[in-house]
């Protein structure tokens, strides 16, 4: 899966993964990240999610990373924000209202960029990637996060043979494999969501579960 794939999806407005509301799991479980006002939370592969503005409204310092320049520009325009724009370490950096978005390759992100980060929130990053890239993504994320970080992870699972991703199925066993070393994993929620996901119903998927995990390092 190459960068051109995602650029084309955004250019053609093929963004069924984008939610027109703040993610309910985030609203229910943000407190589990134990973040204080002003502390930084990372949102990898963030798109133009409304979760960014909601997190900032909770008093947090929000750092998003997104490949698509269109997604980043759309986020600020749709939220009525005029960002300051500059270059930083190969990223195009947009800043406004407590939100910093780094437009560029997530795999170019380094530990120095996250020195002040306390937690991460992943709703649409891990499930956006095919298996080989998921392993690389999880490894890179863990390599650059500070010690004692916390994370909130949302996944989906379904019979992968019944539908081609993205979004891809990420079963519980895979989550635990990716984060086996040095992380405590707590499943916060799991439920059947097939009935409210028409895309999966249309494609004949026989079952669909969503799960939410709290990840604690150290």
Curated annotation (Swiss-Prot):
Family matches, as InterPro entries: SAM-dependent_MTases_sf, Thiopur_S-MeTfrase_Se/Te_detox, Thiopurine_S-MeTrfase, TPMT
Catalysed reaction, written as an equation: S-adenosyl-L-methionine + a thiopurine = S-adenosyl-L-homocysteine + a thiopurine S-methylether
Listed Pfam families: TPMT
Biological process annotations from GO: methylation; response to metal ion
Keyword flag S-adenosyl-L-methionine: yes
Molecular function in Gene Ontology: thiopurine S-methyltransferase activity
Residues the entry annotates as binding S-adenosyl-L-methionine: 10, 45, 66, 123
Subcellular location: Cytoplasm
Keyword terms: Cytoplasm, Methyltransferase, S-adenosyl-L-methionine, Transferase
Primary location class: cytoplasm
Enzyme class: transferase
E.C. number(s) listed in UniProt: 2.1.1.67
Cellular compartments per GO CC: cytoplasm
Family classification: Belongs to the class I-like SAM-binding methyltransferase superfamily. TPMT family.
Identification of the protein by name: Thiopurine S-methyltransferase
Native source organism of the sequence: Pseudomonas paraeruginosa (strain DSM 24068 / PA7) (Pseudomonas aeruginosa (strain PA7))
Lineage per the UniProt record: Bacteria, Pseudomonadati, Pseudomonadota, Gammaproteobacteria, Pseudomonadales
The encoding gene: tpm
């Amino acid at each position: 899966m190459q960068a051109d794939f995602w650029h084309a999806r955004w250019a053609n407005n093929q963004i069924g993964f984008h939610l027109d509301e703040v993610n309910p799991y985030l609203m229910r479980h943000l407190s589990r990240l134990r973040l204080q006002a002003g502390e930084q939370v990372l949102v990898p592969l963030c798109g133009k999610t409304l979760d960014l503005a909601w997190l900032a409204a909770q008093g947090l310092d929000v750092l998003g990373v997104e490949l698509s320049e269109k997604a980043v520009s759309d986020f600020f325009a749709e939220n009525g924000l005029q960002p300051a724009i500059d270059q930083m370490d190969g990223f195009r950096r947009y800043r406004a209202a407590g939100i910093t978005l780094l437009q560029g390759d997530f795999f170019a992100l380094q530990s120095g960029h996250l020195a002040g980060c306390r937690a991460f929130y992943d709703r649409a990053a891990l499930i956006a990637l095919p298996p080989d890239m998921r392993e690389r993504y999880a490894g890179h994320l863990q390599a650059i996060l500070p010690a004692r970080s916390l994370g909130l992870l949302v996944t989906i699972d379904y019979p992968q043979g019944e539908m081609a991703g993205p979004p891809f199925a990420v079963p519980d066993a895979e989550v635990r494999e990716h984060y086996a070393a040095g992380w405590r994993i707590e499943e916060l929620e799991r439920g059947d969501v097939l009935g409210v996901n028409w895309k999966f119903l249309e494609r004949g998927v026989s079952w669909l579960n969503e799960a939410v995990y709290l990840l604690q390092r150290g």
